[in-house]
């Protein structure tokens, strides 16, 4: 299988769009907030949640994947984000239709970041991998929602540039509440060292496991915890009938290195195109 081709890219982008849509739907269900929504736009999904969450749960992905991008559609998008006081941030796949970059460029969008999408084929021998001595993996019903949420938030908060606690809590609660997602925890000598999630979604190429929300407590970093959690999720994905697994990560960070060590390949790099919110003072 050619992992860098358009067929794989379309499936990976579909899965990422589904993932974002499910995050939004779950957050809406948990909070009962009617202002939270996910909009279909030109083949992609636009997430609109709490403005305090920034771009993580307020951005667009999958735009232009098999669908033309129009000025009218983007203008409506800008109005939706502007009404909430948010910049518009759109993650654009290099396999998007040509009109995507043309329209965004004409509307004043600029690139402000990049992210890598990694993919890995799954094989039967992925199921046979066992964790190193001393490390135990627990998942599913063996990891309570409160345990997953508290440890996920604590580990992410200890990072050099932590996101707001409210966002970290929302992401963990969402992962624990989703019916398509399995939560994992790695214990070392009986203590939880790290946590992670895996969402299984359908695509034209079969079921794909999207690996996400992985974190390690500061005291256990550098001891291979995340690598073990990746391997455990690959095993579970294969058992669930998945043909591929995907991970998105910023280039040159620890997640990207662990991903490549686990046999993932870079499928493509996406650009984040952003248009700042036009404030009343800017228009004068």
Each model region followed by its residue ranges:
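Acyl-donor-binding surface of acyltransferase catalytic domains
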Residues: 66-146, 255, 271-275
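A short helix-loop-beta-strand connector motif used in the catalytic cores of GNAT acetyltransferases and
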Residues: 30-37, 85-86, 112-114, 173-184, ...
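A conserved beta-turn-beta hairpin within the catalytic core of GNAT-like acetyltransferases
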Residues: 51-59, 112, 201-211, 221
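Conserved acetyl-CoA-binding loop-helix of GNAT-fold acetyltransferases
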Residues: 70-79, 212, 216, 222-239, ...
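Conserved GNAT acetyl-CoA-binding A-motif
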Residues: 84-93, 237-250
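A conserved beta-strand-loop-helix scaffold within acyl/acetyltransferase catalytic domains
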Residues: 162-219
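N-terminal charged segments
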Residues: 1-82, 97
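Short amphipathic alpha-helix that is part of the acyltransferase structural core
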Residues: 1-23, 61, 115, 124-172, ...
């Amino acid at each position: 299988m050619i992992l860098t081709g358009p067929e794989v890219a379309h499936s990976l982008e579909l899965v990422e769009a589904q993932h974002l849509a499910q995050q939004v739907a779950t957050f809406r269900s948990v909070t009962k907030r009617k202002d939270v929504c996910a909009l279909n736009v030109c083949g992609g999904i636009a997430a609109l949640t709490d403005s305090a969450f920034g771009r993580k749960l307020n951005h667009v992905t999958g735009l232009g994947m098999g669908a033309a991008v129009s000025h009218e559609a983007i203008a409506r998008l800008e109005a939706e984000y502007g009404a909430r006081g948010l910049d518009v941030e759109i993650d654009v796949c290099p396999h998007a239709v040509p009109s995507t970059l043309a329209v965004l460029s004409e509307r004043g969008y600029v690139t402000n970041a990049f992210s890598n999408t990694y993919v890995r084929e799954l094989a039967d021998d992925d199921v046979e991998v066992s964790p190193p001595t001393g490390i135990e993996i627990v998942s599913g019903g063996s990891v309570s929602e409160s345990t997953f949420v508290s440890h996920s938030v604590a580990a992410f908060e200890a990072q050099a540039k932590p996101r707001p606690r409210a966002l970290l809590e929302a992401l963990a609660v969402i992962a624990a509440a989703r019916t398509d997602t399995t939560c994992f925890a790695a214990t070392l000598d009986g203590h939880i060292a790290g946590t992670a999630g895996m969402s299984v979604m359908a695509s034209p190429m079969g079921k794909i496991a999207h690996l996400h929300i992985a974190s390690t407590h500061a005291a256990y970093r550098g001891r291979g915890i995340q690598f073990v959690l990746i391997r455990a999720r690959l095993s579970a994905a294969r058992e669930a009938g998945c043909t591929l697994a995907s991970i998105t990560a910023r280039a040159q960070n620890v997640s990207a290195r662990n991903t490549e060590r686990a046999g993932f390949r870079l499928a493509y790099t996406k650009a984040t195109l952003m248009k700042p919110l036009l404030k009343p003072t800017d228009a004068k």
